[in-house]
């Protein structure tokens, strides 16, 4: 964020609401071409124009925009009177990239002020993805149902602009956004997977989608707080909203002023909500009747308030004891562990059956093999194949790449309850490495292994640094007795999901 303050010289109290003049600053496009707000934020570069993103073209773009008296035109007139001339595609993508950086400034300033005022702990251990699973072990095992709802996409671009106007108070910036959307996106297929991303700036696309999803989440969290005896705790930042309580009043009118009378049906202190990969996931201890009421509440909220057509079939309800939740690269489910206790009182003895609920985390082997298949490590059936694009590299680089991928997957999936699936992934990567090396040296796999020996690829199965540290602390018999290799280990240094794990 310090980069923004150096480049833009913003005054937090007065100037951050007027973002439109920043589109004429060269430093904005330099930040857009770099890494954005800070090094931790992911920036998606434009595939077709990365090599043309030069300072000369940026200056030419700013000069052309400054000379234009009418930047905003209707969608019908855009084809007849293009704003940017022959380089329409290039200039528009550059403007979209710059606007994607600009529109994040108010959020970043508020986030910094919130962190400074709340004195949020800056422990890196709390940022680990694995730190979520101990929480799930403690909470999810006591819940009964999980509700998964696919978030509907807006069918009209104006819905996106209307959702963003509560965050960005600069009307000129919104007009620029509206112009860009109508200029280069089809009204019916703007938010469709993998189509608009190649046309429009991916960073701006993700920002608009998150703004659209957060719009209904604020209302959901508000009603959830009103209907529960306990206050909800969020890991995010509740930012200031305009006309928020007016929206709640309007929502009550949509439900014919009877919604407040029915709030008692939703009283549930054991409820957890999260949004993940285009889905709203709600886990609850409610009965099947009450969880079905939440299902139709989601549908009504989307249809009557956001004017988005949705069907009840897009919302699925499953029992945690019979269903596995695909979350953060693990299949999580609640498993019953039966146990029998023998009790004796005087001369009478009897058996007590007791079942304890525990969280079972498994590797999604099918989806992970699908990711390996897309990356050309194996075929769709999981049979290892060679990696021809790496065959030109030195042998040490090829082995290092495969070993690094194998160790990263082993490190991330160390919390799996069953390690057999992980051994299968290691097998695929091991023989894919062998076939790649054999392809490079124009030999068969058998002849190549016979020439170099079986110890050639032992790095795939050597113990990790963590396992070596445990072996120094505990005696060797401890691992065999306790079956330590089957236990789950959650690490506190994993801050991102591997590309192969994040298959969707």
Swiss-Prot record:
This protein's UniProt keywords: Chloroplast, mRNA processing, Plastid, RNA-binding, tRNA processing
Pfam family, one: MatK_N
Major location category of this protein: plastid
Annotated Gene Ontology cellular component terms: chloroplast
Domain of life: Eukaryota
Localization per Swiss-Prot or TrEMBL: Plastid, Chloroplast
GO MF annotations, alphabetized: RNA binding
Family membership noted in the UniProt record: Belongs to the intron maturase 2 family. MatK subfamily.
Protein name stated in the entry: Maturase K
């Amino acid at each position: 964020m310090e980069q923004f303050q150096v480049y833009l010289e913003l005054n937090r109290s007065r100037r951050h609401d007027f973002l439109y003049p920043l589109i004429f600053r060269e430093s904005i496009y330099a930040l857009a071409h770099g890494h954005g707000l800070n090094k931790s934020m992911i920036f998606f570069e434009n595939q077709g124009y990365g090599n043309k993103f030069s300072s000369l073209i940026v200056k030419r773009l700013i000069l052309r925009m400054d000379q234009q008296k009418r930047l905003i035109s209707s969608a019908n007139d855009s084809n007849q009177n293009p704003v940017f001339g022959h380089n329409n595609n290039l200039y528009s993508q550059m403007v979209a990239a710059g606007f994607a950086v600009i529109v994040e400034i108010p959020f970043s300033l508020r986030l910094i002020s919130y962190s400074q005022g709340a004195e949020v702990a800056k422990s890196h251990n709390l940022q680990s993805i694995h730190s979520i699973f101990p929480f799930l072990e403690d909470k999810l095992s006591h819940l009964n149902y999980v509700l998964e709802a696919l978030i509907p996409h807006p069918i009209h671009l104006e819905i996106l602009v209307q959702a963003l106007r509560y965050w960005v108070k600069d009307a000129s910036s919104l007009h620029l956004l509206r112009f860009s959307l109508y200029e280069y996106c089809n009204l019916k297929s703007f938010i469709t997977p993998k189509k608009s991303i190649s046309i429009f700036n991916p960073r701006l696309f993700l920002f608009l989608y998150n703004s659209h999803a957060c719009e209904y989440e604020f209302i959901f969290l508000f009603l959830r707080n009103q209907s529960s005896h306990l206050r909800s705790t969020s890991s995010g930042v509740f930012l200031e909203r305009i006309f928020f309580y007016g929206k709640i009043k309007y929502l009550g009118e949509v439900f014919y002023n009877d919604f407040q009378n029915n709030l008692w049906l939703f009283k549930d202190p054991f409820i957890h909500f999260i949004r993940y990969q285009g889905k709203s996931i709600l886990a609850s201890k409610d009965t099947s009747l009450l969880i079905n009421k939440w299902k139709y509440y989601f549908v009504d909220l989307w249809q009557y308030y956001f004017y988005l057509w949705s069907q009840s079939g897009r919302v699925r309800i499953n029992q945690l004891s019979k269903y596995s939740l695909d979350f953060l690269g693990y299949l999580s489910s609640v498993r019953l562990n039966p146990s029998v206790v023998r009790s004796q009182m005087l001369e009478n003895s009897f058996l007590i059956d007791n079942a304890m609920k525990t969280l079972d985390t498994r590797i999604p082997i099918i989806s992970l093999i699908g990711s390996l298949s897309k990356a050309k490590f194996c075929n769709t059936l999981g049979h290892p194949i060679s990696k021809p694009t790496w065959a030109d590299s030195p042998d040490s680089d090829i082995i290092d790449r495969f070993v690094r991928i194998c160790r990263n997957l082993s490190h991330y999936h160390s919390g799996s309850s069953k390690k057999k699936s992980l051994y299968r992934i290691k097998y695929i990567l091991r023989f894919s490495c062998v076939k790649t090396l054999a392809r490079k040296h124009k030999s068969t796999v058998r002849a190549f292994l016979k020439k170099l020996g079986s110890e050639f690829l032992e790095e795939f199965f050597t113990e990790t640094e963590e396992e070596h540290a445990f072996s120094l602390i505990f005696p060797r018999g401890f691992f065999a007795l306790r079956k330590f290799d089957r236990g789950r280990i959650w690490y506190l240094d994993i801050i991102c999901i591997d590309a192969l794990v994040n298959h969707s």
